[in-house]
Amino acid sequence: MAPPLLTLSNIHLTFGSTPLFEGAELTIMPNERLCIVGRNGSGKSTLLKIAAGMVDHDDGKRWVKPGITMRYLPQEPDLSQFKTSREYIEDGLVGADDSYRIPYLLNGLSLTGDEDPQVMSGGELRRAALARTLAPKPDILMLDEPTNHLDLAAIEWLENEIKSLSSSVIIISHDRRFLENLSKRTLWVDRGETKLLEKNFSFFEDWRDRTLEQEKLDRHKLKRKIHREQHWVIHGVSGRRKRNVKRLKDLSTLRTQFKTQRQSTGNLNITVADSHQSGRFISKLVSITKSFGDKKVFDDFSIKITRGERIGIVGPNGSGKTTLLKIIMGEVLPDKGRVELGVNLLPLIIDQKRESLNDEWTLSEALTDNGGDKVMVGDNSIHVIRYMRDFLFLPEQAKTPLHALSGGERGRLQLARGLRLPSNLLVLDEPTNDLDLETLDLLQELVADYDGTVIVVSHDRDFLDRTVTRTIAYENNSKWQIYPGGY
């Protein structure tokens, strides 16, 4: 068996007073395709940065096979020092790296190389960073959320490119289909530890649930054993002194073990404010046409959306998905055609831009608005700590300033704030960006149980397949087609 390329052994790391890792392990083998999964804030990105040598650890050992090359894709690439995307990509080449791949990668990722970083979109910045990371064909390729801001065509191209590489590839992603198509092994980062599944991600969730159930059973057995020993201390201390001293010491050890176990934070339990029912139809578009300058976005498109439907909208970046959404909502008028809106609509829009919040607010203040300890969900008053727990926040995070939250935690906060308000039309514009897999599970349940109409714009194939009943898909040349079901 070939030796590993990189290992992390017994890694410990603490931020402030909170331990992030307590004995984390990672092994990268030749021809590896490993996915790293875990909840937001569990330390996935930090573990990847430790492996890349970008973050120091407090204790433990990092070993890298001499002479290997590594490349790391950051979540937020910085192109501010470069005049063009090509200049940024070429700057990533070193030594014997050959620049022949750059035109191929630019073409595959729909870039010209002449893009100005100052005006590039999030998707263009991400594609440029991918090209820079992929260009050298490194021995180890580390990708942190590579599908964020990519459209479906770019995601599928990236899957095929990764499959063609001989590099060992480590992936952090919330895109289930992407992980299922690429991973060979799965590393779960959970409460400071790492657990390895020697199988593809498609087996992970069943394995995780069984592991947590067994852990719950083991903890219950430990609690019962402590109870029996405590009973002995009260009623049965007699006989040989040495035996008694040892048994008392064992009881102390059991208590410490029980106390220091980090329990699972549970599952999301999303509460949605009640609202009045909308009319029978939500929005009707009749033969609409829309252009921006010389670019025609829609040409003779019609659809009628009725109450209770789950509508998905898919298409390449720049094809007009958000414009279509705004036309459906009556926020943008078509150049030709007719738009009719239903009655009694109460829309709730959760979009990829994230609402602007005061970063100095605490999490509690952002949820209560008035700084009290109650959250108003429709007409119901819920204690802020309970409401936080429903969205996987810990009670001790109540006083955490918003600037200290991760991208995924801010996404959960946006959901928590939005769902306080009554609505009967839920609009999700790229809702899966930055959310962890558990949050996506519950967002899917929310869409399924929502007592109203849902419209989703997304590049997440698995999310669409699990949630929508009809899909509006971009075909080509301003033509859009309606299909039953998901992607």
Describe the predicted segments one by one:
Residues 229-238, 252-253, 268-275, 282-284:
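Alpha-helical coupling/stalk and coiled-coil linker elements that connect catalytic or binding modules
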